[in-house]
Every structure is written in structure tokens, then in C-alpha cells.
Amino acid sequence: MSRHRLTALPLAALLALAACATPPRPEPTPVALTFTPSDQNVTNPERGFFTPVDIVTTPTNFETLRTALGYTLVRSYVRLDDYRDQDLPQTLLDDLDHALGEVRAGGVKVILRFAYNFGPYPDSEPDASREQILRHIAQLTPVLQANGDVIAWMEAGFVGAWGEWHTSTHGLHADPEAKLAIVDALLAALPGDRMIQLRYPGDIRFLIGEPLTPEAAVAATDDARARIGHHNDCFLASDSDQGTYEREGVTIDEEKAFIEDVTAYTPMGGETCQNNPPRSECPIALEELARFHYTELNASFNKLVLRSWEQGGCLAEIQKRLGYRLALEKASVNTTVRPGGIIDLTVTVRNDGFAAPVNARPLEVVLDGPSRYNVALPAVDVRLWAPGQTVTVAVRLRVPANAPAGEYRLGLWLPDAAPGLRDRLEYAIQFANVDTWDPETGLNILTPTFAVDPQAGGVVEPGTTIFAVIP
């Protein structure tokens, strides 16, 4: 009987055979996630009813305004009556800087307006000359630049009665060159990512020409045309909103169409000023709040109008929908991953508010567990999440190969864009869903059970050390 000689195969060949015999384990299967919408008002930053506060002269507990009363915005006049003919004293600048620090400490933001009088109309107290206004803006610039993080946006102010750009005792409301110079100075005084609001559509048209598209506006870097919104301080008070519209030969319909386009990418707000049924009642109020993308409104004025909304059953809806109201609809994601493996995530979000978020902020995916990893999605701009629309975000993410095994949570984080506010929970956006918000971290939790498991399937990249978007 012959003997067969057994020949040892090289080690490399054995490994190759083993690899052929053991194919790579498949990628983990995505799981469908669903979410329950909330019917509650969500106390979110840079939106909602605001309360008027004189931040310079009136000591205010801003944290109480936010936590007990639900305000994330305050509107503050800064009165300059005593300085119509002279420079601002350093004490006033210091007081304003301190007040803005208190706003920051309390976790809210402010809508500023500088004014030299409080009317009356039509025989207003004086405002200041063009030259003095420009000098005051120059003096204020360092304070505004240093505190831009807590300035939501700024009403143009300075000119005329109440700073509303009418009834100027120096004729500035009728001086195009003065208007242009003052607006240029205001935009330069603020950080480039902050906007101003003007009282009259005609002034906005004069300054920007035709509206941009929202896509062009968010792509613009420090472009004046993308930084001028509107405040209507007599919303619903008459057919023309007490002269807000139908000025200088332009029809109401033309001006409303213009403002509808402008406010798709700029802040819109203001206040009601007198009861005017049926125009000021719920049906038309809801229609125009949505059409003109209202982000904020005065909670204190006009009381008769606000009471009519409460009696008409729409006040709670208005409170919930001022500005953005983002809600998770559904998501799909694999809930296990190997270190160095891939998370395949798709999320659908609906905006039930009247407006999109005004100021830029990142959208980040966070893997939170034995270690925390977060990555911004640079292709996503939440300012384009338009009201009434549903947006789907699909992204593939590589988990670090050195991620510790264990149980994690997967969430979305929308922090403030300012570095000093990024980790402040009160400045993060909360989705309008049940049982997704984590008040300890500011995360919107997509799934509370997500495993980093070395035994999971899928192809890995062994050298990666960061949580990253896969192009």
C-alpha cells in the first residue's frame, strides 16, 4: 500500500483559504424608528413671544423669565435721550456691556433697539442728527461685537419716534443717503452673522433691491442683502397695518409679496398695536403669521388683541408655532456597529413653525456612551428647513476604530454656533417630540440603545481614530 506524503501549505496560503471559507459578516441591518410629536410649547432659543425689558436700567432675573415664564427672547429699548447732541459716556457703554452679560448668564437672547425718544406721535420729541447717530453707532460697536452671541438680532432704531424710522425731527426718515449710511454703520457694528430689522418695507426695498432666495441668502457671507428683516409694530391694526404698507405709491399687495419673500430668510417680528376685528382675530392672524414667517412677537402689547386670540382659541397655537417648530418624523439606522465600522443614518424632520431658524447653527450627530463622539454635518443648513416642509437627512458615519465597546445612545445636537454658548443646554434646539429630549446633555435622542460591538458585522477601517462623515 502506497503512502501519501502530506505537504505543509505555506502559512499565507492557509490564511487565504480561511478568508475564503469565512466571508465577511454582512453590515448590520438598519432599524426603522418612529417618534411621537408633542403638543406642548417648546421653550427653544431665538423664537417665541418676547417680553419687553429695559436691560440697562431695570435689574432682571433672566433665568426666571426663561425657566418660570418660558421666554427665551427679550426686547430692550436702550434710551439715548440725554445724548442727542453729545457722545455717549463710558458709563453707559459699561452698563450696556454688563447688562448683556446678565442676559448671557440667564440663558436668553435680546432684541435691541436704540432710541432718542418715546414719541409721541405726531409731535415727537427730538432724535439726533445723522452725524451724531453715526458717532454713537461707532461708540457702541465694541460692545455689540463683544456680545453678538446674545443679540438675537437688532431693530434698526435711532431714527425718529420710538426709533421706528418715521417722524424724525432731523428729517432722516425722508433722507435716502442718511438711511443708507446708518444701515451700513449698523451692519458693520454687529458681527457679520447678525441681522437688523427695519420698520417699513419701502426702506427695505430701497436698501436691498429684490429679495434673495433662501439658498442664496444662507450662502452669502456678510452680505447686506441677506441681513435685513422686518418688524411690524402695528400688525393687523388696519388694512395697511397703520401705514406699514401702501407707502410711496406701492400697493399693499405688492409690499406684502415683497415682505413674504424677504422674511423667508430674515427675522420677522414686532407687535400688535390696536384691536381691529375681524382682521386682528384668529383666522387672519394665523394666515399672516404663517405667510410672513413670524419668529417673535410682543407678549405684552396689545392686550386686547392677545386676549381675542385666547378667546378665539389660537393663542396656544401661535405660541407653539412662532419661529421654528422642528419635529422628528422617522429615522432609519443600524443600532449596532463594530469599532471602525459604519453608521448608516437617515432622519426625516418636519417644521411645523411659522419660520425657519434665523441664525446659523450646526447639526451634529452624537454617539454618547463610554466615550462621547460628535460630528457636524457640513452639508446641512437648518436655516433652509422651511416652515411647512419635511426634510430628510441621509448620512454615513465612520465610528473610530478605538471606540470602547459598550452601550451608547445616538442623538442629534443643535447647539448655538457661538463657541461660548455651544455647551449651554438652554441655547440648544429641542425637537417637538415626546421622550426624545435629554435636558442633561441637550441631545435629541434617536435611539437610547446603540451598541458598539466588536462581534458585529460589517467592513471596518482599522486606522480611523475620529468620528467622521463618509463623503
Predicted segment positions?
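Active-site groove signature of glycoside hydrolases
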Residues: 111-121, 140-173
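Extracellular/luminal regions of secreted and cell-surface proteins that mediate adhesion/ECM remodeling
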Residues: 319-471
